[in-house]
Curated annotation (Swiss-Prot):
Domain DAGKc positions: 178-325
Protein's name in the database: Sphingosine kinase 2
Region (Required for binding to sulfatide and phosphoinositides and for membrane localizatione): 1-175
PROSITE patterns (UniProt xref): DAGK
Outcome reported for the amino acid change (mutating residue 477 to A): Reduces phosphorylation levels
Function: Catalyzes the phosphorylation of sphingosine to form sphingosine-1-phosphate (SPP), a lipid mediator with both intra- and extracellular functions. Also acts on D-erythro-dihydrosphingosine, D-erythro-sphingosine and L-threo-dihydrosphingosine. Binds phosphoinositides. In contrast to prosurvival SPHK1, has a positive effect on intracellular ceramide levels, inhibits cells growth and enhances apoptosis. In mitochondria, is important for cytochrome-c oxidase assembly and mitochondrial respiration.
Gene from which the chain derives: SPHK2
Keyword Protein biosynthesis attributed: no
Binding site for ATP: 188-190, 220-224, 252, 277-279, 351, 357, 622-624
Species of provenance: Homo sapiens
Length: 654
């Protein structure tokens, strides 16, 4: 027993393996990234068997199984000691799989090889939980032959997860797999309710390690820290930038990319978002695009992490917003005026509640409902999209209120910008890891780290397993390692990391680069005759790009990431508080346009101008308050790239 425990401990202490993290050798050009992010070939029929075989279990004294791999799932049927008439839990959808690896026994006399899959199925209460399953390849007399069979299955499964084609009649070997992508993770450790770093460490990092992705990680420390970093980033060394926070951090990243002299190349860098903030609108849209049911909190994070592990980019529209002072910024989400922006900014003091702050802010806003006089002008879309009334309403997300964290002790530091620091959680601020860092992240145990499913799912055995040394990146060996925090100074970032050294005079203001707004005349000048103008008293005006205004608010249910449209929604004065509340309740299902509210208006546009005529008010861009006054905006279709998972992956959940 002592030997077994010691072996398991040694397994957890195995050294990091080098993750080069590229989709090919040499610098990463836009062409290389485009090929890597290209949509996969048309999928095979979901029921077409790709592989079939008989395997044992781990430990060896367990039952035996017949495995069948299709393009959508791994089918498992127990053969011995007692065949199953009706297999229970014998279907593992690939939509729930983060990755797989091959393993070998530490016993020299064991000629079997093993492959392990990492899954995140839903439990009885609907929440996801991590589970592993390990299968024993023992049909051949030698370890080399059994290892080849285990690698064949692991390679085929990985190809399906990443949308890579399998050879029709060719041999399936690890050579089919490209080198793993290298991601830069930017984490706001105080995001949302102060859980961002905890969730990143406990859920995100293990999952992307299981997927075999290479990553480096840095925690943001101040306002516009992320913007400064990406402004000087060596883009050729990275295949994607992923923010672990709310919508505000991605706003900084995109504006930093567009503020570079090489913005035309920089804006094509794939970006992703893993929701750990209080405002997770884009993540809600990604979740819906991936086919998952609406979710909040940790469940939404796990859904988006699964999609990130699958890879795959999607064109992303970006809105260029010119403010009254002439400065310009870029939006991927929304421009709001009136009730929505009032709630967003005035609910700041309730940020510790997470997304529930908006519910409370809405109730308080209804109690003091204001109207604003203004003028909205827009250039109608050349081709109008389908009616904004959805064919059917979307299901509501489960409540996040049960995920309230323990209160964190206060920390003595100056307040930071809302997109950088939301709660004073006392956590270290490590710098980005360099290759060969001596302090690796905790290694995942082979058969645990999370709850196991009951029954035939793998458990600890008498002969612990170790990673197959011939595989490029077994799970649990992330390249990212966290340095000790640097006191009172800027983090030391090695030149090999591909990151710029932060400088005090880095530009953090409005963007001076980016595409020209050829549809917009200068602010204050007359608009062309083909524009439509509305003037009057409004309760709110919202210009939104994706479908979601919040993780559980579907403001434009028909919107797509690359439809080239800005979706204008407004509510005129005269609406009652009860009717406005009904609109927002219906927005949780995306059915608010079907209520027939006479004050609710909608238009699809390519550009718009908003001129507030009320002397006081609040304007927000992507949830961030901007200067109050006239503004105008133009949509630039598909100039960005968003990591969303492969098209059509996964199918709508049952």
């Amino acid at each position: 027993m002592n030997g077994h425990l010691e072996a398991e401990e040694q397994q957890d202490q195995r050294p990091d393996q080098e993750l080069t993290g590229s989709w090919g050798h040499g610098p990463r050009s836009t062409l290389v990234r485009a090929k890597a992010m290209a949509p996969p070939p048309p999928p095979l029929a979901a029921s077409t068997p790709l592989l079939h075989g008989e395997f044992g279990s781990y430990p060896a004294r367990g039952p035996r199984f017949a495995l069948t791999l299709t393009s959508q799932a791994l089918h498992i049927q127990r053969l011995r000691p007692k065949p199953e008439a009706r297999p229970r839990g014998g279907l593992v959808p690939l939509a729930e799989v983060s990755g797989c690896c091959t393993l070998r026994s530490r016993s020299p006399s064991d000629s079997a090889a093993y492959f392990c899959i990492y899954t995140y199925p839903r439990g009885r209460r609907g929440a996801r939980r991590r589970a592993t399953r390990t299968f024993r390849a023992d049909g051949a007399a030698t370890y080399e032959e059994n290892r080849a069979e285990a690698q064949r299955w692991a390679t085929a499964l990985t190809c399906l997860l990443r949308g890579l084609p399998l050879p029709g009649d060719g041999e399936i070997t690890p050579d089919l797999l490209p080198r793993p992508p290298r991601l830069l993770l930017l984490v706001n450790p105080f995001g949302g309710r102060g859980l961002a770093w905890q969730w990143c460490k406990n859920h995100v990092l293990p999952m992307i390690s299981e997927a075999g992705l290479s990553f480096n990680l840095i925690q943001t420390e101040r306002q516009n820290h992320a913007r400064e970093l990406v402004q000087g980033l060596s883009l050729s060394e990275w295949d994607g930038i992923v923010t672990v926070s709310g919508d505000g951090l991605l706003h900084e990243v995109l504006n930093g990319l567009l503020d570079r002299p090489d913005w035309e190349e920089a804006v094509k860098m794939p970006v992703g978002i893993l929701p750990c903030g209080s405002g997770n609108a884009l993540a809600g849209a990604v979740n819906q695009h991936g086919g998952f049911e609406p979710a909040l909190g940790l469940d939404l994070l796990l859904n988006c992490s699964l999609l990130l592990c699958r890879g795959g980019g999607h064109p992303l529209d970006l809105l260029s917003v010119t403010l009254a002072s002439g400065s310009r910024c870029f939006s991927f989400l929304s421009v709001a005026w009136g009730f929505v922006s009032d709630v967003d900014i005035q609910s700041e003091r309730f940020r510790a509640l997470g997304s529930a702050r908006f519910t409370l802010g809405t109730v308080l806003g209804l109690a003091t409902l204001h109207t604003y006089r203004g003028r909205l002008s827009y250039l109608p879309a050349t081709v109008e999209p389908a009616s904004p009334t959805p064919a059917h309403s979307l299901p509501r997300a489960k409540s996040e209120l049960t995920l309230t964290p323990d209160p964190a002790p206060p920390m003595a530091h100056s307040p930071l910008h809302r997109s950088v620091s939301d709660l004073p959680l006392p956590l270290p601020q490590p710098a980005l890891a360099s290759p060969g860092s001596p302090e690796p992240l905790p290694i995942l145990s082979l058969n645990g780290g999370g709850p196991e499913l009951a029954g035939d799912w793998g458990g600890a055995g008498d002969a612990p397993l170790s990673p197959d040394p011939l595989l490029s990146s077994p799970p649990g060996s992330p390249k990212a390692a966290l340095h000790s925090p640097v006191s009172e100074g800027a983090p030391v970032i090695p030149p090999s990391s591909g990151l710029p050294l932060p400088t005090p005079d880095a530009r953090v203001g409005a963007s001076t680069c980016g595409p020209p707004d050829h549809l917009l005349p200068p602010l204050g000048t007359p608009l062309p005759p083909d524009w439509v103008t509305l003037e009057g008293d409004f309760v709110l005006m919202l210009a939104i790009s994706p479908s979601h205004l919040g993780a559980d608010l579907v403001a434009a249910p028909h919107a797509r990431f690359d439809d080239g449209l800005v979706h204008l929604c407004w509510v005129r004065s005269g609406i009652s508080r009860a009717a406005l509340l009904r609109l927002f309740l219906a927005m949780e299902r995306g059915s608010h346009f079907s209520l027939g509210c006479p004050q609710l208006g909608y238009a699809a546009a390519r550009a718009f101008r908003l001129e507030p005529l009320t002397p006081r008010g609040v304007l927000t861009v992507d949830g961030e308050q901007v200067e109050y006054g006239p503004l105008q905006a133009q949509m630039h279709p598909g100039i960005g790239t968003l990591l969303t998972g492969p098209p059509g992956c996964p199918g709508r959940e049952p």
